[in-house]
Amino acid sequence: MSLTRLLIKDFRNIESADLALSPGFNFLVGANGSGKTSVLEAIYTLGHGRAFRSLQIGRVIRHEQDAFVLHGRLQGEERETAIGLTKDKQGDSKVRIDGTDGHKVAELAHLMPMQLITPEGFTLLNGGPKYRRAFLDWGCFHNEAGFFTAWSNLKRLVKQRNAALRQVSRYAQLRPWDLELIPLAEQISRWRAEYSAAIVEDMADTCQQFLPEFTLTFSFQRGWEKETDYAEVLERNFERDRMLTYTAHGPHKADFRIRADGAPVEDTLSRGQLKLLMCALRLAQGEFLTRVSGRRCLYLIDDFASELDDARRGLLSSRLKATQSQVFVSAISAEHVMDMSDKNSKMFRVEKGKITD
């Protein structure tokens, strides 16, 4: 599925834009602050319901406006789908699909699987475990129909359990929450373990192409001891959890650890090497989705040239072309992306929120 049309209104510094897009490569070229990243962010927001540079809705809506409006047309092999998202300063969203309201943001996310590569994306590698959980959960969401509901219920139950820990004095008082929490936790952990085991070979192969000088290993940590029932862990750690006033073990504490030559990648790799690794992981995940489901990702790449030499840019470009996916790339200069361009590509110039092709 590719995004053939994008309408943007009052998003960041873009007052209004109507873009006809290529199903292949789309380049956004302009100076820093011109609005090229805002176009990428509009696409991301249309598929996620939130921006990637700020969680504060007031910073995303154009100055002195009440709401932003995003519309898109998705072209699949058999049909076209119209999608829309409106969000106001109070954070209230309206999702429209094929002319009908009342839809959920998760439906947009399912329609538009996308991979985001930005200069801020290093958190996948040097940030906390929550970023690597999100990496796994993206794959589980697109691979398991029941994942999103289970994950949402897990978040709710952990929050309720943490609140209850401040009020109870005996474990028996907490058991009603745990009876609901335990099967959800075990199911989500199984899905994550199965997904990580299935994709690890693809990741290793892709990472070897981008970083042949390192041996990379991947390990999923589910958030509590191996070979131990989650029910036993919760009961055994009740007093400690009550003292901490939060649940210290569970899938909400899981991690996906990545090592280079046996050491954490954040301690071993340079910033340029970390960007290569991030690109390799996102690419491998998108390719895996295509291989197992036949669905293709959209790739959003901000500041393409930064910290990549010509050879690495060429490698990333060739791998992206091989996916036959739709790709959006921002760059300061057209020279940085000319080698990626072909007869099916589109080049957009961005200046002070105005976009021309």
UniProtKB/Swiss-Prot annotation:
Pfam families the UniProt entry points to: SMC_N (PF02463)
Key words of the record: ATP-binding, Cytoplasm, DNA damage, DNA repair, DNA replication, DNA-binding, Nucleotide-binding, SOS response
GO molecular function: ATP binding; single-stranded DNA binding
Gene Ontology CC terms, in alphabetical order: cytoplasm
Keyword DNA repair tagged: yes
Highest taxon of the lineage: Bacteria
Location within or outside the cell: Cytoplasm
Binding, ATP: G30, A31, N32, G33, S34, G35, K36, T37
Sequence similarity: Belongs to the RecF family.
NCBIfam families, per database record: recf
Function: The RecF protein is involved in DNA metabolism; it is required for DNA replication and normal SOS inducibility. RecF binds preferentially to single-stranded, linear DNA. It also seems to bind ATP.
HAMAP family: RecF
Protein name: DNA replication and repair protein RecF
Annotated source species: Klebsiella pneumoniae subsp. pneumoniae (strain ATCC 700721 / MGH 78578)
